[in-house]
Amino acid sequence: MTISIMGNNVTPIQPNESVNQVKRSPSEAQANFASTLKNAIEDLNHIQLESDKKTEAFASGKIDDLHDVMITAQKSSVTLETTVQVQKKVIDAYNEIMRMQV
């Protein structure tokens, strides 16, 4: 039984040039941050409204699935708590930047 040597078929990993070329102006970065923040707040609002609708529907007897209502309410609660914690971290970071001496 002969064993032949396999060639070196592994090519080295090349750096992704598009990652290195991502340079944004401050206004582009601010616009990106603002749109991300706006989308997160809109998502939170949508989740809160969905939870309210399901809770009202359950209370009025339109739906009987308590499990789904509780999952939606918990999802809403966790999302709100996460948003509040992120807000606190952003404010802390802003205050830290304002304390820096130039």
Curated annotation (Swiss-Prot):
In the UniProt record, does the keyword Repressor occur? Answer: no
At the top level, the lineage of the source is Bacteria
Any Gene Ontology CC annotation: bacterial-type flagellum basal body
**What are the protein's GO molecular function terms?**
cytoskeletal motor activity; structural molecule activity
UniProt-listed GO biological process terms:
bacterial-type flagellum-dependent cell motility
The record, for Pfam families, names: FliE (PF02049)
**Chief location of this protein within or outside the cell:** other
Task: Give the UniProt keywords, A-Z.
Answer: Bacterial flagellum
Cited HAMAP family:
FliE
Question: What name is this protein filed under?
Answer: Flagellar hook-basal body complex protein FliE
Native organism is Oceanobacillus iheyensis (strain DSM 14371 / CIP 107618 / JCM 11309 / KCTC 3954 / HTE831)
